[in-house]
């Protein structure tokens, strides 16, 4: 994998600065690292990791069957490949 060198603290600072512009931020959802890299390449402002989308990717209905371990592991993998801030729901 191609990990980025940007520290999470710098991603937070970048996100706060984007929020301070009062512009509408475009934050599409990513369900895997490849999608996150494409989101960054296209030029979006951040990446959104949704439990519902992740459940769909795993073949589960969106009724709370994904575990905290599933979400945290996938979110970690996604955040490592992009310099964009990652919002996890």
List each language-model region with its residue ranges.
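Short, flexible micro-motifs
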Residues: 32, 54-55, 62
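N-terminal glycine-rich anion-binding loops that anchor highly charged ligand groups
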Residues: 37-55
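Alpha-helix-loop-beta-strand connector modules within alpha/beta enzyme cores
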Residues: 10-14, 60-88
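Hydrophobic faces of well-ordered beta-strands that scaffold small-molecule active sites
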Residues: 26-32, 47-49, 86-89
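N-terminal amphipathic alpha-helix/helix-capping segment at the start of soluble metabolic enzymes
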Residues: 1-29, 33-42
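General secondary-structure edge motif
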Residues: 18-20, 51, 58
């Amino acid at each position: 994998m191609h990990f980025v060198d940007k520290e999470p603290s710098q991603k937070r600072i970048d996100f706060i600065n984007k929020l301070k512009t009062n512009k509408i931020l475009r934050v599409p959802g990513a369900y895997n690292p490849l999608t996150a890299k494409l989101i960054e390449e296209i030029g979006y402002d951040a990446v959104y990791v949704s439990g519902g989308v992740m459940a769909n990717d795993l073949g589960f209905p969106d009724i709370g069957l994904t575990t905290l371990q599933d979400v945290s592991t996938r979110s970690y993998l996604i955040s490592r490949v992009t310099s964009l801030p990652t919002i996890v729901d």
